[in-house]
């Protein structure tokens, strides 16, 4: 499964936002 850089960045941003929400 090959994702381009923009897709990876979008996924990372989404995951970190969810993680921040879960930790706060």
Curated annotation (Swiss-Prot):
GO terms for molecular function: rRNA binding. The keyword Oxidoreductase does not apply. GO terms for cellular component: ribonucleoprotein complex; ribosome. Keywords: Ribonucleoprotein, Ribosomal protein, RNA-binding, rRNA-binding. Part of the ribosomal stalk of the 50S ribosomal subunit. The N-terminus interacts with L11 and the large rRNA to form the base of the stalk. The C-terminus forms an elongated spine to which L12 dimers bind in a sequential fashion forming a multimeric L10(L12)X complex. Forms part of the ribosomal stalk, playing a central role in the interaction of the ribosome with GTP-bound translation factors. Belongs to the universal ribosomal protein uL10 family. This is Large ribosomal subunit protein uL10. The lineage of its organism: Bacteria, Pseudomonadati, Pseudomonadota, Gammaproteobacteria, Enterobacterales. The gene is rplJ.
